[in-house]
């Protein structure tokens, strides 16, 4: 069993602490460290990949007899992405280009960044995943990859996304495959659309329900496919190690909120079909998860995995905070 801690969201902790921290991690009974390898940090300058800090960390892990799980944080994109791939910004449900920004839990890089339906964005993201895989696939103490952290793609969008031309084109293509033709869609939906360009996603409930539910279904399938594509890139350069992904919670509990559509991060059952395993996060104190809720979460993920590897990818071990709010310590079981 991999029993470990997450460490290093670049550039913290400072390098002067790494040696003593890894020594304490091992002495505390852990056997694994999970490291975030962030695209925005590694390729801060276009076409120049810098892994010096991660090289040192995996070296220290080996020295202290710790396995490593490497998380490819491709969704935290480089600050230059909009400049080098013009016209790739996400568009929200108000028709506004989304202004990306740094995330509260990571020091450098932007989210949501550019839309992965833009082929130029996906090409660059895939190259980061491939380059990272080639660099570390040969590690003797590599325990596996977490190919997509919490299945996040729209953090900091501040509204519903994505309505950019590339996503709309992908949505209409998905509809055509689903219904066979525009006539087939009109028959199923009881509509009179004259051309595919007239078919728009629903934005909110009752605007209208049919178009809204269809777009939500598309976003779920889109996330599933994106995870499969990430997996394919990594598997091509690492045919040996476990490749998983995990959501912030099981997909069955992902009901959406004012800034996200329900299950827009993919369906765990379909995700597991193309991955080596599936996982989830759990923050018992932060989200008031009791023992029954915790057990339900694990059972949901195990059900989706259907015999594949199951990881509790993140588990709150201490206090948590959002802004200046503070929370109590995690209660013992």
Regions found by a protein language model. Name each.
Residues 18-102, 129-133, 224-238, 242:
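Aromatic-lined substrate-binding rim segments of carbohydrate-active enzymes
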Residues 1-3, 29-31, 62-68, 138-143, ...:
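Short, well-ordered coil/turn segments that N-cap beta-strands
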Residues 5, 25, 33, 61, ...:
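Conserved, mostly hydrophobic/aromatic
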Residues 21-29, 58-64, 134-140, 267-273, ...:
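Acidic (Asp/Glu)-rich catalytic clusters
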Residues 93-277, 281-294:
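Polysaccharide-binding and catalytic clefts of secreted carbohydrate-active enzymes
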């Amino acid at each position: 069993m991999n029993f470990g801690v997450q460490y290093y969201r670049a550039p913290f902790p400072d390098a002067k602490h790494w040696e003593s921290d890894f020594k304490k991690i091992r002495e505390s009974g852990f056997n694994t460290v999970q490291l975030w390898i962030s695209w925005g940090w590694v390729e801060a300058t276009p076409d120049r990949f810098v892994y010096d800090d991660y090289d040192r960390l995996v070296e220290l892990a080996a020295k202290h007899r710790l396995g490593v799980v490497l998380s490819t944080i491709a969704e935290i994109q480089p600050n230059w992405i909009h400049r080098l791939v013009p016209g790739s910004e996400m568009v929200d449900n108000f028709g506004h280009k989304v202004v990306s920004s740094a995330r509260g839990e990571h020091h450098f890089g932007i989210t949501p960044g550019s839309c992965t339906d833009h082929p130029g964005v996906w090409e660059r993201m895939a190259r980061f995943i491939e380059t990272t895989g080639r660099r570390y696939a040969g590690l003797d103490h590599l325990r596996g990859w977490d190919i997509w952290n919490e299945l996040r793609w729209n953090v900091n969008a501040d509204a519903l996304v994505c309505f950019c031309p590339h996503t709309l084109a992908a949505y209409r293509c998905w509809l055509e495959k689903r219904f066979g033709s525009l006539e087939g869609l009109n028959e199923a939906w009881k509509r009179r659309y004259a051309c595919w360009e007239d078919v728009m996603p629903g934005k909110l409930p009752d605007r209208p329900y049919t178009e809204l539910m269809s777009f939500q279904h598309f976003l779920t399938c889109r996330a599933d496919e994106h995870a499969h594509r990430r997996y394919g890139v990594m598997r091509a350069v690492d045919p040996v190690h476990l490749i998983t992904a995990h959501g912030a919670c099981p997909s069955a509990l992902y009901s959406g909120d004012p800034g996200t559509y329900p299950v827009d991060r993919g369906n765990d059952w379909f995700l597991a079909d193309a991955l080596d395993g599936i996982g989830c996060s759990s923050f018992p104190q932060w989200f008031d998860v009791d023992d029954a809720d915790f057990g339900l979460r694990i059972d949901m993920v195990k059900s989706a995995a259907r015999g594949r590897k199951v990881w509790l990818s993140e588990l709150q071990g201490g206090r948590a905070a959002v802004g200046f709010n503070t929370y109590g310590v995690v209660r013992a079981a």
